């Protein structure tokens, strides 16, 4: 497998695949952050998480088209407007879903899984009816096109660098909200002991609703970022939902650091193996490795201790 390449060729290949893995890592982190908040903090298995991501992608696509026709002078910075709208739309829909559906199914994981899976099918059909079955893509601003020539053999796309920078900023913001804000302290109090948190005056229902909305809103941002590197279709979210659950479970539920470490290891392993093997074989080997590790450490790499 490696005999056909010189050392310099292998170095360039590993560097390029490593950067491709970083782009995949960025998508995984943005998706997994929202899912880790919902699954790790609330214990809800949200099978419709990918559809909240696609809602953010469609909002970005609509914003791109609207800005080009109504206010073309805003086009170079339309993505920042679209990202805010994507977060708002996905977060608002998430809060509505929590109020109408999820709050009735707490402590019933199988019912929650079935209900959110049905919701994912409903949302897919809704997207197909409104936007059509064909995939759509956004037009990138001129400053986001092209690539940076790192070396003679290594080119790094600018849009990929932008997605990685966005991921870093969102991760820092989420860490601040969860660990240093007063609302984040309430969330962690509810996770540690829901009954005691309610006894000291924390509105646990409100915390649940805003937590679910935040997780879905971050998925919307992930969808917005996804449009920078790929096209969007009604079922595109299903391509990432399994990998995202793997990231969360492998890293350890409710562990922000575990989510990041897990996303990095999975994306880098998968991206590197894809060059030397087929994409399907890379996924199989990655999955088998994760299963083997989880058999030894079923709580994940960095699981948090939770008081019962």
Where are these regions (language model features)?
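Membrane-interfacial amphipathic/re-entrant helices at transmembrane-helix boundaries
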Residues: 1-31, 59, 71-82, 108-113, ...
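Inter-helical junctions in multi-pass inner-membrane proteins, predominant
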Residues: 13-20, 174-182, 208-254, 270-283
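Single transmembrane alpha-helix segments in multi-pass membrane proteins
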Residues: 15-63, 96, 100-111, 128, ...
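Short, non-helical or kinked segments that cap or interrupt transmembrane helices
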Residues: 37-58, 107-112, 183-186, 209-210, ...
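Pore- or pathway-lining transmembrane helices of multi-pass membrane proteins that form conduits
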Residues: 51-58, 103-128, 237-249, 265, ...
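Alpha-helical transmembrane segments within multi-pass membrane transporters and channels
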Residues: 70-119, 126, 173, 261-266, ...
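Transmembrane helix-bundle core of multi-pass membrane transporters
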Residues: 104-105, 112-180, 207-210, 272, ...
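Helix-loop-helix "hairpin" substructures at the membrane interface of multi-pass membrane proteins
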Residues: 153-232, 256-261
């Amino acid at each position: 497998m490696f005999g056909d390449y010189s050392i310099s060729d292998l170095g360039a290949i590993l560097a390029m695949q490593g950067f491709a893995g970083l782009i995949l890592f960025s998508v995984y982190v943005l998706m997994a952050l929202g899912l880790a908040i919902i699954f790790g903090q609330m214990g809800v298995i949200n099978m419709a998480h990918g559809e909240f991501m696609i809602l953010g992608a469609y909002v970005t696509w609509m914003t791109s088209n609207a800005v080009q026709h109504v206010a073309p002078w805003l086009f170079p910075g339309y993505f920042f407007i679209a990202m805010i709208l994507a977060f708002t739309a996905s977060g608002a829909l998430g809060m509505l879903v929590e109020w109408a559906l999820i709050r009735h199914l707490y402590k019933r994981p199988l019912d929650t899984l079935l209900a959110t899976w049905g919701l994912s099918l409903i949302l897919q059909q809704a997207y197909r009816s409104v936007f059509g079955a064909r995939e759509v893509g956004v037009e990138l601003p001129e400053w986001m096109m092209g690539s940076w020539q790192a070396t003679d053999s290594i080119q790094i796309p600018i849009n990929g660098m932008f997605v990685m920078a966005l991921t870093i900023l969102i991760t820092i913001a989420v860490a601040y909200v969860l660990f240093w804000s007063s609302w984040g302290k309430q969330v962690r109090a509810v996770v540690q002991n829901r009954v005691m948190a309610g006894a000291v005056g924390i509105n646990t229902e409100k915390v649940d609703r805003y937590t679910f909305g935040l997780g879905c809103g971050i998925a919307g941002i992930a969808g917005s970022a996804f449009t920078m590197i790929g096209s969007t279709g009604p079922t595109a979210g299903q391509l990432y939902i399994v990998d995202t659950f793997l990231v969360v479970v492998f890293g350890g539920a409710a562990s922000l650091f575990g989510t990041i470490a897990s996303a990095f290891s999975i994306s880098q392993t998968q991206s590197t193996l894809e060059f030397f093997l087929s994409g399907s074989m890379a996924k199989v080997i990655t999955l088998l490795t994760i299963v083997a590790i989880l058999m030894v450490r079923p709580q994940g790499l960095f699981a948090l201790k939770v008081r019962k």
